[in-house]
Amino acid sequence: MEKHYGSGDGKGQRILNPVTEVYMEEGSSMEMEMEQIKGVDSTDRQTIAELKGDARLVVKERLMTHGTQTAVSGYQVNLNGAGATADVVSRSVARDDSSQTFNARITGNAPCSGHTECDSIIMDNGHILAIPSLEANNVDAMLVHEAAIGKIAGDQLIKLMTLGLTEQQAEEQIINGFLR
């Protein structure tokens, strides 16, 4: 398991630009978790993965930006062997004037299956760009992408506020649950 974690109050220049390359042999498996909850002013995470037959890759990303922070997440997954599978999932929240880009590309070069998903909550003056991309080079490559960007639903806030939470507390509860 690989985990990138950034936290803090967002003051100063905190920059995180990791590049991860993964080469998976037949029958191998790997799970990666990336978690960044505020605290990093600028990040550009790039991940490249090459999977041979029956290899399994799971990537889970949880991201929250605020202030003027920027975050770029790039994933290039090549499913090169029969039975290779990949699941790349991102959940993110952009607050204040922050900006996020999620760019996930899955290429199926063999009978394989791949899935990428990006679910985001946008708040204030945030900016989110989701770029899910699929390429099939084999008739038996089964590839799926999903992307959704939206705001917190008013009825969710009202429900929590009727239980005694302030609007800010209700927003935090919703965000914390979403990023789990």
Predicted segments with their positions:
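Conserved beta-strand/loop scaffold segments within soluble protein domains that form the structured core
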Residues: 1-158, 162-165, 175-180
